[in-house]
Amino acid sequence: MKKFFIHIYMFAAAVLLAASCETPLFIEPVGDECQTVLQARLLTSDSLHTVHASYSLHDSVIPADDLTIRCFVNGQLEAETSEAGRMDIEYDITTDKRAAYRFRASIHPGDSVRIEAAGPHGVATARLKAPDAIPVPEVTWDNEIRRTESGSTYSVIRFRINVNDIPAQRNWYRISARARQVVNEYDHSSYPIHEGWYKLIDREMDVDIDNTGDPLLNPDGREVEKWRKDYMANKHNFFTDELFEDGSNVLNLAGLARDYKYLTNMGFASYCDYMVNISAIFDLQSLTREDYLYSRMLEMDNFSLSGIGIVDRLFSEDAVLPDNVDGGIGLVSVRSVTRVTCDLGTFKPDIRSIFDYDNWPPVSPTDL
């Protein structure tokens, strides 16, 4: 079966075969013996990009390690690489099936992009255009104390993000969040390594965002379960402008305060003071329709409700995923990113209770 990631259809075929024991079903391979599969999601906010490449055979998938990848932006060659690696992604069992080609290129909203993969089986080419970028949104926030069923309390940061639609066209979006931590250290020992305040850590981390209070992202208010794929909960926060076309909409999101303040992989000295600045970073991604449909279909795959496979019920025939690779198969997309940073404050925690994140004291003017 020479279709891009149609394991949905193959599963349905296996079910039919198991249910038809009296009549053997023979599947004859069709199409080319070997096809180049390209997958990539390029972001205008990144300078380092990755193209995943495989060879799809009739009975297996293997990494395409012998390609030369070229990236053209507005007709000009931006990058070329023949160095194939692997993505070290925990819990991803498909990493040994894909070669990863990394290159640096500058891509902006509205740019025309062409990705070429040249190898012994010919040249596979993907042509795409970076969508327009969404205007920079206004973000406000406040703290809220919530109570668990057992009566204990915890702190939540509520965000209100006023999104303005790109006018005069249909649009598809996604919002994601990260936390930025800047930790400064003041050494009071007799022989300090650094004089005065010294920047010890400056890092960003992915954080979960709660969309249960937003009717656009999660109309049913479904809570995301950590170990369960739930298409309806929209964990990755995709949305369209269908309900606010050419207008604006306020996204209501929330995050645990401790997720933004969690200080991992560092030690604390009793003779030092620490000052921590916390920021929330939101990326508003503008997608093509094909990228949106592909991403949502991947989320739908394997989603079950009360033991019923939703995909098997919805698709009565082959599920056709978007494909924009000439001379091969796959989907290469580019997303235009609008980034906004929200300062959540600077704190001076006591090292004796530094993990009591909900009660960190804010920095006073005398500490600066």
PLM segments and residue spans:
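A sequence/structural signal for flexible, mid-protein segments enriched
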Residues: 22-368
